[in-house]
């Protein structure tokens, strides 16, 4: 039997890996950071060199990369991704948490993927006003994998796709947890704190409010396939 000599391929070898971008989107409390951590640890088990980058201004859970339930991982804090490009070039897998806060996220991820890195980004897709958060959505057409997670609505316990701000701040970047934000469903997004629907013609809500917030209109009457008298006539005939 003849033997075939296979080349020695080491995990993380720049000449053997194929770059890609994976994007994890969703509202707050949907498990984005948890999923990012799971994927990075999966590569670590396979002996890949990994680097996690976190937003430097988010100091809620010390300098570590942390999920809301306090699972932590070593991370490199940064405000601009170009400031850590040398560290990123020394690894095979790059995880980026709170990707929506980095203004150079698209350029960085594309360059790293083109150089053979696997880049995994966890980010909010929308602001508290349900508008695109920074340039993060520009990653979608560049990514090999995109997933949007949902949370549990913190007001009615249904599926939640949006982030609702509890305070009155108007600026987009306000870092906080459950003290400042709720994950909410479509209906609860448009409710005021009192539980009443938002006013349709208010300047703050008119752009995002649906056309109707009351009870959905009843569907027109459906014609029955077999009326009662039709069934009775058939019985008499038999």
From Swiss-Prot:
It catalyses: thymidine + ATP = dTMP + ADP + H(+). GO terms for molecular function: ATP binding; thymidine kinase activity; zinc ion binding. It holds the Pfam family TK. The keyword Kinase applies. A motif (KEN box) lies at residues 206-208. It comes from the Eukaryota. GO terms for biological process: DNA biosynthetic process; protein homotetramerization; thymidine metabolic process. ATP binds at residues 26-33, 58-60, 97-100. It is found in: Cytoplasm. Disulfide bonds: none annotated. Its main location: cytoplasm. Substrate binds at residues 128, 172-176, 181. Keywords: Acetylation, ATP-binding, Cytoplasm, DNA synthesis, Kinase, Metal-binding, Nucleotide-binding, Phosphoprotein, Transferase, Ubl conjugation, Zinc. Phosphorylated on Ser-13 in mitosis. Phosphorylation of Ser-13 by CDK1 during mitosis reduces homotetramerization and catalytic efficiency when DNA replication is complete and intracellular TK1 is still present at a high level. Polyubiquitinated. Postmitosis, ubiquitination leads to proteasomal degradation. The KEN box sequence located at the C-terminal region targets for degradation by the anaphase promoting complex (APC/C) activated and rate-limited by FZR1. Zn(2+) binds at residues 153, 156, 185, 188. The modification Phosphoserine is found at residues 2, 13, 235. The modification N-acetylserine is found at residue 2. One of its GO terms (cellular component) is cytoplasm. Cell-cycle-regulated enzyme of importance in nucleotide metabolism. Catalyzes the first enzymatic step in the salvage pathway converting thymidine into thymidine monophosphate. Transcriptional regulation limits expression to the S phase of the cell cycle and transient expression coincides with the oscillation in the intracellular dTTP concentration. Belongs to the thymidine kinase family. Homotetramer. Tetramerization from dimerization is induced by ATP and increases catalytic efficiency due to a high affinity for thymidine. Tetramerization is inhibited by phosphorylation at Ser-13. Interacts (via the KEN box) with FZR1. This is Thymidine kinase, cytosolic. It comes from Bos taurus.
């Amino acid at each position: 039997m003849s033997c075939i000599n296979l080349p020695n391929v080491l995990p993380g070898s720049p000449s053997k890996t194929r770059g890609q971008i994976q994007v994890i989107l969703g509202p707050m409390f949907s498990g984005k950071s948890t999923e990012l951590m799971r994927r990075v640890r999966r590569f670590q088990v396979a002996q890949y060199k990994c680097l996690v980058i976190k937003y430097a201004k988010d100091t809620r859970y010390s300098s570590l990369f942390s999920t809301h339930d306090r699972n932590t991982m070593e991370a490199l804090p940064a405000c601009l991704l170009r400031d850590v490009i040398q560290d990123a070039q020394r690894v095979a897998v790059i995880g980026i948490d709170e990707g929506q806060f980095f203004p150079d996220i698209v350029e960085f991820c594309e360059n790293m993927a083109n150089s053979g890195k696997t880049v995994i980004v966890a980010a909010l897709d929308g602001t508290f006003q349900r508008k695109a958060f920074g340039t993060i959505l520009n990653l979608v057409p560049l990514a090999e994998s995109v997933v949007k997670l949902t949370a549990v609505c913190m007001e009615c316990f249904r599926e939640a796709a949006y982030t609702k701000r509890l305070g009155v701040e108007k600026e987009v970047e306000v870092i906080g947890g459950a003290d400042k934000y709720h994950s909410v469903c479509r209906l609860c997004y448009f409710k005021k704190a009192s539980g009443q629907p938002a006013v349709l013609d208010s300047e703050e809500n008119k752009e995002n409010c649906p056309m109707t917030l009351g009870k959905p209109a009843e569907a027109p009457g459906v014609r029955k396939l077999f009326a009662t008298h039709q069934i009775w006539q058939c019985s008499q005939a038999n």
